[in-house]
Amino acid sequence: MSATSKSTTRTYIAIDLKSFYASVECVERGLDPLTTNLVVADKERTEKTICLAVSPSLKAHGIPGRARLFEVVQRLREINEERRKAAGKDFTGKSYSVKELEQHPDWEIDYVTALPRMSHYIRHSAKIYNIYLRYIAPEDIHVYSIDEVFIDATSYLSSYQMTAHELAIKMIREVLSETGITATAGIGTNMYLCKVAMDIVAKHIPADKDGVRIAELDEESYRRKLWDHRPLTDFWRVGGGIAQRLSMYGIDTMGKIARCSIHQEELLYKLFGINAELLIDHAWGWEPCTMELVKAYRPENCSMSSGQVLQEAYTYRKARVVVQEMADAIALDLVEKRCVADQLVLSVGYDRESLTTPTGREYTGPVSFDRYGRKVPKRAHGSINLHRYTSSSRLIGEAILRVYDDITDKRLLIRRLSISTNHVISEDLLKQKTAKPIELDMFTDYEEVKRKKQLEDAELARERNMQETILKIKHRFGKNSLLRGLNFDEGATAKERNKQIGGHKA
């Protein structure tokens, strides 16, 4: 039974495991996660591959948590050049240990590269979640991501006769003792404040001997400490687009958003519509959403999506194979979840090298800029209505290829693909939906319409039986135990992606 209280004043704790993937890999190697230079990345790919994580000691050198591997190499090359000049001689050794590098200024900074192991990280995350469950009921824990949770600690503080800080540190110490992984925590009077305390305030306070940082905020201290904080993108749910639109009106802090909500509230609603309400609440440190509401939430409509960044630039024909594979996979996913959808959306992202090829130079369409300011042909987007709810691989595959052929510029090279299924509902809900009335006319042969529908339904039933058989085989013998001829075509990626979780090695 949940210990959730009905009192108005609540206490929330957010806990974020520090550089989780990198910390797991350090601990597995008997290394200190806080003093070891380590990146989690598949170096078998190109240096453009995204690092799944970097250790805290590398972050201290200005390397972002989701850097590309070449950015790590480039930054360390710059730092090592500075170290070599300071030493006044060539390096006499190298190390990935911060402690050793401090003792030997004439050594080169090195780092460990760990291959991603997603299934291993998931097991570690589950183990840590079970540690939280020793203290908190599952109804009062919201798993935000593989390495982050929200906890409604309101009713547990009196039971344990602890402050929120004491309860947080007790759980974090237990996680550290059993896994070797440390954490950062935020405490607040609502879910927004505990998140911001963790993300912003905790980063600016000294860590204890185990690297633990815990910060606390209420509405008053939030306004006092963070109303003038910059940049706005440090705040939860404020992305670059929102910050950019606000900056056009001279608004670059939460304090200015709060003041604007008093005198020019209509401006915020003009810019962001209904989302302005959330932005205004957060500017004042308010958050009406409780743990109880989070747990009770069920979306009326949902979607399923699949996306991938290709390992190299693909031609139109090669990428078409991948689109077919993705459509087949998403249809099987719908069958497995006993769901159906009636709309598909396709997004095609082009490679920047497209503009340098002989055919690409002919391109005169719209361009955008990547994160490095380089010109890239603008993404292509398209959607199609299926005119019926379905999980058929055939119907979904045929429809998405029509969209692909229609929206894709055949002259350009392709780097990114994503497919979304919209208006996803359960098969049970579909059965409850009443059939729409048909407007009869004198020129339609309804017997022929009925006959065609019966034939199509029979064909779809046969396909459904085949899909369920495929799923049973894959569940028992592995995803690659049954492959289509398509999966062996040039450019096919399904066989390799079946060995991955979230685009990284399982």
Which positions does each model-derived feature cover?
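Gly/Gly-Pro- and Ser/Thr-rich, intrinsically disordered tail segments characteristic of DNA damage-repair
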Residues: 1-282, 287-291, 442, 447-506
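DNA-contacting surface of Y-family translesion DNA polymerases
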Residues: 14, 234, 240, 244-414, ...
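Short aromatic/hydrophobic contact patches that present stacked aromatics
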Residues: 150, 385, 418
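A glycine-rich phosphate-binding loop feature that marks nucleotide/adenosyl-phosphate handling sites
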Residues: 189-192, 281-284, 340-352, 413-426, ...
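Short, well-ordered secondary-structure micro-motifs
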Residues: 196-197, 356-359, 429-432
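C-terminal hydrophobic structural anchor segments
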Residues: 402, 406-465, 471-472
